[in-house]
A protein has these predicted regions:
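Short linear segments in intrinsically disordered or otherwise low-structure-confidence regions
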Residues: 6-7, 32, 43-45
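Residue-identity detector for glycine
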Residues: 3, 9-10, 24, 38, ...
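Basic, polyanion-binding surface patches
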Residues: 52-252
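Intrinsic-disorder-associated, low-complexity terminal segments enriched in Asp/Asn/His/Tyr and depleted
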Residues: 4-5, 13-15, 42
Length: 252
């Protein structure tokens, strides 16, 4: 079971080091850090457990809590890749972010997925909804074995990358590796998105994504307990709150 923990969200713990990793990606953040009340200390005595303590000013209602990890909401996806032994394979992940045509995912260095992606340099990010939760969990718990046939997942190889595109996942990103940075047992995989695929009912007549129709599951929790969270039907267009505030100010 420990292997499942390392796959499903396990790499989110390392994102505190991404400021350093971005330097390898030729991006540097030059703006000074904002000042905060109190003092932030990182304590890591033996590397086995990291603790953070925030010494707040008097009257601050927040309190520090000790935990080995904190996942504040990451979309779950099924990572598809070619496998030298099994032909095609999948595993479950939750550590990713995307900017423009770039995608960064985190995978444990000792995992089969990391070895295979290093070899083939290509993969797919298959994003399920709540209808595929059983298969999603099974893909995470089973380790170093063939999983696509075992789980009964229908797929087709991508024409661009030959990585598996899962039929049951409404949204898929087809990706090619640009570079891999390994740190503290984690492979941070920087990739270019070659293609974005979505089921037809998620696109309008002009080919625009219907944001209110897609509801991926999110991974959330701490060292004590991890859970899945789901989206509801509420949406607000980007910038709508500023527009409302301006209208309110204009009336006053």
């Amino acid at each position: 079971m420990s292997g499942y923990h390392s796959k499903l969200g396990g790499t989110a713990d390392t994102y505190s080091s991404l400021s350093c990793l971005w330097q390898g990606f030729s991006i540097a953040f030059k703006e000074p850090r904002p000042k905060v009340a109190g003092e932030f200390k990182d304590i890591d005595a033996d590397g086995a457990k990291a603790r953070s303590t925030f010494l707040s000013k008097e009257g601050d209602m927040k309190q520090s809590f000790e935990t080995s990890k904190l996942y504040y909401g990451f979309p779950i996806f099924i990572l598809g890749y070619q496998d030298q032994t099994h032909g095609y394979n999948v595993t479950t992940c939750s550590s990713s972010y995307s900017l423009g045509d770039w995608l960064v995912i985190g995978v444990g260095s000792e995992e089969n997925a990391a070895d295979q992606i290093k070899h083939y340099q290509k993969f797919t990010v298959n994003i399920p909804d709540e209808n595929l939760m059983l298969e999603m969990e099974q893909a995470g718990f089973i380790s170093h074995r063939e999983k696509i046939d075992k789980l009964g997942l229908d797929f087709r190889p991508s024409k661009l990358t030959q990585a598996p595109i899962l039929d049951a996942c409404p949204v898929v990103l087809d990706c090619k590796v640009d570079r891999i940075i390994e740190e503290d047992g984690i492979c941070h995989i920087f990739a270019k998105i070659l293609d974005r695929l979505a089921e037809s009912d998620l696109l309008d007549d002009r080919g625009h994504f219907k944001n209110d129709r897609f509801a991926p599951a999110y991974f959330m929790g701490d060292g004590h307990k991890r859970v899945y969270r789901y989206l509801d039907d509420r949406i607000d267009p980007m910038g709508s709150f500023i527009k409302k505030a301006r209208k309110k100010n204009d009336k006053s």
